[in-house]
Amino acid sequence: MAAMRRGVILGGVAAGPEGPLVTAARTGRTAVRARAVIRVESAPDGTARLIELRSDVPIVLRQTGASPGRTRAPSTVPALSADALPTATVHLVNATAGPLAGDDLGLDISVGSGVRLVVRSVAATVALPGHGPGPSRFTVSARVAPGGALDFAPEPTVAARGSDHLLVTDVHLATTAWLRLREEIVLGRFGETTGSIRSTLRVDMDAHAEVDPPSEPTPLLRQDLVLGPEIPGLTGPALLGSARALGSLLVAGPDPVGSPAARRESVPAKRAESGAQAAVADGVALLPLAGPGYLISALAENAVTLRRRLEQGPAPATV
């Protein structure tokens, strides 16, 4: 039934209050290609203004909040915590079931100087099998300008049985930009085995502004994760054990102390920000990066426990 609704939506043009919306292009018998765009800049009055919010079915974007910020920050000053910036909040809505096999979906994000963009989703994404060519794919490409901030934390991606899904996240940060990025993966729906899912995370940061001539961006994080029933020993004690949910939380920028995770009195997070050693506890670990930030990785038997471990971080014990 979901596939029938999918065909109806993608076969025509969805009408909006101001005229037709963009329609996703077909790439195969059932596969679709779609690219949505979010661009936020600082308005003359100091607020965060969405200068482009372009949906592309099945990716629907809705602005759900805005705040003026506690102060107006010069774009070159990194001392201001990111949550004090003028903020725009956008939610992602899946207009159809899926993604299905062969779907190629993407989201382009651009954050200007002196503003913050918060991106959330209204529900989990369930990757499903289908008749399209190759795996389904969702790509997020983001650029954050000096003094800008991106808080990207959608709901989990669920790899349903028989699915083959690829997640790609590519972020480019200016020297004084700030990033909070959370990714959560759930292996299968309730009572079923997992599908195959691969996650690639690349985060680069510009060299210091005083370097002349400018050098190539510095890699801040490279992370590849491959999961699925074809992986030998996936549920063994050396890998996931009984865990069915896993994820990571990356915080990077000139003032990570002002991040929401640090304000929760997470002792390991504060240690990481001050250059202390990594911290580890049951199902969760914190790794200081060779740049301004840290990475929390966790696994759990369910999505609720996973979220708590990512947000709170490990216990104060260090290794």
Swiss-Prot record:
<dbReference type="GO" id="GO:0016151">
    <property type="term" value="F:nickel cation binding"/>
</dbReference>
<comment type="function">
    <text>Required for maturation of urease via the functional incorporation of the urease nickel metallocenter.</text>
</comment>
<dbReference type="InterPro" id="IPR002669">
    <property type="entry name" value="UreD"/>
</dbReference>
<keyword id="KW-0143">Chaperone</keyword>
<feature type="compositionally biased region" description="Basic and acidic residues">
    <location>
        <begin position="262"/>
        <end position="273"/>
    </location>
</feature>
<comment type="subunit">
    <text>UreD, UreF and UreG form a complex that acts as a GTP-hydrolysis-dependent molecular chaperone, activating the urease apoprotein by helping to assemble the nickel containing metallocenter of UreC. The UreE protein probably delivers the nickel.</text>
</comment>
<protein>
    <recommendedName>
        <fullName>Urease accessory protein UreD</fullName>
    </recommendedName>
</protein>
<keyword id="KW-0996">Nickel insertion</keyword>
<comment type="similarity">
    <text>Belongs to the UreD family.</text>
</comment>
<dbReference type="GO" id="GO:0005737">
    <property type="term" value="C:cytoplasm"/>
</dbReference>
<feature type="region of interest" description="Disordered">
    <location>
        <begin position="254"/>
        <end position="273"/>
    </location>
</feature>
<keyword id="KW-0963">Cytoplasm</keyword>
<dbReference type="Pfam" id="PF01774">
    <property type="entry name" value="UreD"/>
</dbReference>
